[in-house]
Amino acid sequence: MAKEKEHINLAFIGHVDHGKSTLVGRLLYDTGVIEDKDLGEGEDKFRVIMDTLEEERERGVTIDLAHTKFETDNYEFTIVDCPGHRDFVKNMITGASQADAAILVVAADDGVMPQTKEHAFLAKTLGIDQLIVAINKMDLVDYDENRYEEVKQEVAELLKTIGYNVDEIPFIPISAFEGDNVVEKSDNTPWYDGPTLLEALDNLEPPEKPTDKPLRIPIQDVYSITGVGTVPVGRVETGVLEVGDTVRFEPAYTATGGRKGEGEVRSIEMHHEEIERAEPGDNIGFNVKGVGKNDISRGDVACHPDEPATVVTPDDTFIAQIVVLQHPSAITAGYTPVFHCHTAQVACKFEELIEKIDPATGEVIEENPDFLKTGEAAKVRIRPTKPMVIEEVSFIPQLGRFAIRDMGQTVAAGMCVKIEKEE
C-alpha cells in the first residue's frame, strides 16, 4: 500500500466578492474532484460548490467532505473553511478548522479592501505562517502586468506591516473564472514566469506534528456506548495518546477535587478502526475506564496526570492580547462576554484594560485605556467566571487562542500570553 500523502489544511481568505468560492470551485474542477454535472450556470458555475456547502452547513446537514479535498503531487489538501460563512472568523480562531496554510485572494480590479486586512491580520495572529497570494480576476483588467504589480506592491506592504516575510510568499496572477495560472500555466500572462497556484501549493512545507509536547485533547462530545462505556471524542492537538495510558480530564478533575475525571484508556478508535496510538491531527474516540458519562463534558481537555492541562479558575486571571473585530459600541472593564477557546465556552470578565497596542507593529499606543473600539488591539487582564483550560500561546498555541462572542457575533479574537495563578 502506498504511503498516504502528507496532509495540509488550507484556508481561503480575503475580501468578500474577490472570488474565493469561484477559486475553490475551479481548483476542485481542474484537479478532477468535481465534474461538469456538479457545476452551475453562467457566472456562478464554480461558486455552486461552495454555495451548496454553505446551504448544507446552514441547515446542519452533514457536509459531503469529498467536495472539500483535492490532491497535488506531494500533498492531500483539505479546504477547512471558506469565509463569507457566518462563523468563519470564529471557526478560524477556535481551531474547528485550524489551517496550516492560507491562500489570500485579492481582486486585481479592487486591490486591498477592509476584509483583506482583517483576514490577513487574523491569519498571522492565528499562527498561519504559510501564505500564498492569488491576485484574482486578471481577466477583468485585461491581464495587465502594471496593474498586477500595483496590487502586488499594495498587498506586500500590508503583509510586511503585519509581520510576514514577503520574500517567502508567492504572488500569482490568476483568473479563477477563466482558469489562468490556477492549475494550468496561462498564455495570457507571458510576462509572469512564476509557479501556478497548484505548483505553489505543492511547494508548501508540511506542518510539523507537535508529538513532543504534553498531551492535549479538547473534548467535542462524550458518548456512552452500551457494552463499551464512556467514550469521549476529540482531536489530538498535541502529544501522543496510547492504549493503557492514564488520562485526566480538566477542569472536571480540579473542579471535583480530584474525585472524578481520571481513568485508564482501554481502546482508541479512528475512522471506525481500532488503533493503538493517536497523534496530533487525529480525530478519535477513546474509551476510558473509571470515568462516567456525566463526569466530563465538551470543553474538558484530556491530558496526562504528570503534565496536566492548565486550569484557570475564577480566583485566577490571565493576560491576553486581543483585537476587536466588531463591537457596536466599546469594550470597557467589567464587560463579560463568552470566550470560545478550543471546544470550551466560558463567560469571562474583562478585569482590566492594560494597554492599547498598534495592531500592525505591536507598539504600545496608550496605557490603561478607558475603552476599546472596533479595529483596536490591546493587552487585557481576564478573569473566567468558572474553571476552564487555557494555555499560554508560547507553550501550546492550539489551546492559547480564543474568539470572544457576544450578541451572536464574534466581537474579538485573541491569545493568552500569560497565566496568573492566585498565590
From Swiss-Prot:
Major localization listed first in the record, in broad terms: cytoplasm
Family to which the UniProt record says this protein belongs: Belongs to the TRAFAC class translation factor GTPase superfamily. Classic translation factor GTPase family. EF-Tu/EF-1A subfamily.
Domain tr-type G as annotated: residue spans: 5-211
Cellular component terms (Gene Ontology): cytoplasm
Protein name: Elongation factor 1-alpha
Protein's organism: Methanopyrus kandleri (strain AV19 / DSM 6324 / JCM 9639 / NBRC 100938)
Residues that, per the record, bind Mg(2+): S21
Positions with a binding annotation for GTP: 14-21, 81-85, 136-139
Known catalytic reactions: GTP + H2O = GDP + phosphate + H(+)
InterPro entries for this protein: EFTu-like_2 (IPR004161), G_TR_CS (IPR031157), GTP-eEF1A_C (IPR054696), P-loop_NTPase (IPR027417), Small_GTP-bd (IPR005225), T_Tr_GTP-bd_dom (IPR000795), TRAFAC_GTPase_members (IPR050100), Transl_B-barrel_sf (IPR009000)
Subcellular location: Cytoplasm
EC number: 3.6.5.3
Record region (G4): 136-139
Keyword set, alphabetical order: Cytoplasm, Elongation factor, GTP-binding, Hydrolase, Magnesium, Metal-binding, Nucleotide-binding, Protein biosynthesis
Enzyme class at the top of the EC tree: hydrolase
GO molecular function terms attached to this record: GTP binding; GTPase activity; translation elongation factor activity
PROSITE patterns per record: G_TR_1 (PS00301), G_TR_2 (PS51722)
Keyword Ribonucleoprotein among UniProt keywords: no
Region (G2): 60-64
Renumbered residue ranges of the record's region G1: 14-21
G3 as annotated region, ranges: 81-84
NCBIfam families for the chain: EF-1_alpha, PRK12317.1, small_GTP
Ranges for region G5: 175-177
Primary role: GTP hydrolase that promotes the GTP-dependent binding of aminoacyl-tRNA to the A-site of ribosomes during protein biosynthesis.
